[in-house]
């Protein structure tokens, strides 16, 4: 997301802001119905509502979507960040591409072992701890970035951000932007509803809550935290654009900002 902000500006924040809306849908509409029926997984719900064939088809679609759309992005971004911070390629004297592939494999294996050995409880505890660290650490990145932009002054950094290349702050995407404003309120809402309200990896955490109220609190708290994503993920991309306009790849915006 920081890389997209580096290239296209603030309009990409729509992906995160609309996620908060669909998390409210999860808390108020979907979760009560899931728990009322005693559903343990989303495929269980679909089998009860339709038939076993539907469940098998949806299971297959979920697996393909996770393997093709979600996991590659997570593993690639994690590998890119780790390689930029710890210079794995240089340390092992291998190419940049080989270092990324190595880290992708190691991250994937670590995730599998963690999920299998620790189970859902360990994942929930780790998510809570990681969430606190990500919010605190994530907010520090734009703060230090603005100080660097202002040559030691936070306020001068804000002034430069709002006056130099101010067009980057336009959050209303045009027809040629990656996220046009019309798409943010039509197709993107549907995509985010699918992800946040039916994705097994997301919903399973709320289904494992002690009660409906606790699950709703978790979903609504997540919605609040998603509203911070423009500051944590999008703003660093804009800051990186001001500081490093000659990056070979936009995806390097966030790791370069953190590393420097």
Label each residue range with its predicted role.
Residues 10-115, 187-195:
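Helix-loop-helix module between adjacent transmembrane segments
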Residues 10, 52, 119-120, 128, ...:
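Membrane-helix interface/capping residues of multi-pass secondary transporters
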Residues 2-14, 47, 92-100, 132-260:
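Loop-to-helix junctions at membrane interfaces in multi-pass transport proteins
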Residues 116-117, 136:
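Transmembrane helix irregularities
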Residues 27, 107, 117, 199-203, ...:
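Residue-level signal for cytosolic alpha-helical hairpin/rod architecture
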Residues 61-65, 126, 221-222:
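Hydrophobic alpha-helical segments of secondary membrane carriers
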Residues 108, 128-129, 136:
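Short, well-ordered loop/turn elements at secondary-structure boundaries
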